[in-house]
Amino acid sequence: MDRAVEFFKKKVNDAAEEKEILQIKIVGDYDADGMNASAILYDAIISYLKANSLAEYAEVSVRLPRRYSEGYGLSKKIIDESESGLIITVDNGIAAIDAIKKAKDKGIDVIILDHHLSGEELPCADIIVDPHCEGMSTFKHYCGAGLAYRFAEMLITNKDLLDKLLVLAGIATVADVVPLIGANRYLVRQSLKLINRGIATSGVLALVRKMRLEKITAEDYGYKIGPVCNASGRLLDDGAMDIFHLLSQELDVFTLDYDEQLLKLHALADTVIERNVDRRRITEEALERSDALISQQCLADDAVYIIYDTQVSEGVMGIVAGKLAEKYMRPVIVFAHAQDGEKLKGSGRTYGNIHLKNQVLDPCKEYFFAYGGHAGAAGMTIPEKNLMLFRNKVRKLDIPVLYREKRILYDLEVTKEEIPELYEKMEFFAPFGEGNPEPVFFIRNLELSPVRGKFYEQNGSDGKSIKLFTMPYPSSGYQMAAEYLLMDAPKKIDMTFEVYTIYSHGKEHRRLRMLDFCASKNAETETSFKKGLSAMLNFM
């Protein structure tokens, strides 16, 4: 990384000596990692130029690829937009062999900050920083924003700004699902401390206020802030730029138009939050269509579901595939029409230990225009006429149909009296995420105690989730209402669970997150009268 920073400084200083203006273009990505990484680099570079009286010798811009019309990464089209200067790629670039060659042929300097695996050939960039390249780093698990923060840390000395950029790196580290170990664990822990003290860019603080988040956790990064960052880039061709402008925005309270700028920032936060609501709706609609499509396309007995959905948006295919893989307990690939209408685009997610690229895609490579991925996820484009050929070839592959019974392993069996102590212990092991999963607990004979005459209540917009009034804290089960009611609403259960806390209006509310449950074997048998009375009380 030190070579990258020194190379950057030299390019700026050379331009200043020649009284020239250096064009600096940051090329990121349209996901949460790429947008946060771009914001980190942009703010850090602007700060460096101002602090060293070099601002008049450089023009800094950010270019995020357009999801639908351009696709991922640095392309020749983006290179065509520049005639000279310096391009810094972040969260991409290691695979852009042809585009970077074109840049070098035009005399453009290139720095790559990427965390993806390289192919056999490396691009001819001036500087490559990729922890997966041999000899680059002893820590291999940074995301793009983590690398961008390390660059910023070596470039500038402004501690206040570095703290704000660290928050962005923490959000991206969780959202990009890289392992929360080593340096990443430090980044996220420090990021959470800072944001909960109100330290972040003006845009992030506006987003947090509009989302009504109080004590922010890694779970909020992964399941609330991260999805909002991703939604604009999923739904709109150039929507990622809105998130970049939000994340990188730092308002000066001493400017005359501060109030006006703050209103605009809050309006932008409202807009991107609403887009995530739209993204959830579109995803749910696609999931609701899945059962019919599986039946219509005769997929029920396949070891891999290859689903063609004419209505699904390209931007949510990966989310849909992931949720379906969990639901049907097998790898799922979802195809949709590409926006240009000439081919199908697909996104796949695996289940269990099936390697999606090696076991499913590699044996069928002759059917694709292009494909790529790894064990857990993959993307591909295919001529529509080849879809059935691809399906039939996959059916002939030796891919195991996994054991269909859902099993959840737990770390520790506890009693009701031990549950409160778990919350204090969890603080020591947090933050949780990829590589550091939350502990799973098991409890037997957990009794429900009525609250205002009710043992449970159904919740969620569709009433499919449930809240059980257990002691010492309520238990929440996502999409578990039907399962509980089919068991005749038992008043004593065995349950695997995680502990979590909700913060609302300055108060802490402890909850148990249900993972699986069954009626306790030694539960008291209810008479029909008692069962009827219980049901009546629950719905009064």
What does each model-identified segment do?
Residues R66-Y68, H116, H132-E134, A338, ...:
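Short, solvent-exposed coil/turn elements at secondary-structure transition points
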Residues V90, V320, A325-E326, F442-E447, ...:
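Short, solvent-exposed secondary-structure boundary motifs
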Residues K77-D80, I87-K104, I108-V178, L187:
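Conserved phosphate-handling catalytic cores of large alpha/beta enzymes
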Residues E20, G182, Y186, Q261-Y308, ...:
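Mid-to-C-terminal polyanion-binding domains and interfaces
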Residues Y30, G34, N92, S137-H141, ...:
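Alpha-helix N-cap/helix-initiation motif
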Residues M1-L86, K106, C124, I156-M388, ...:
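Hydrophobic helix-and-loop "lid/oligomerization" segment in the mid-to-C-terminal part
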Residues Y68-E70, E134-S137, K416-E417:
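A short acidic, often aromatic-flanked loop/helix-cap motif at beta-alpha or helix-coil junctions
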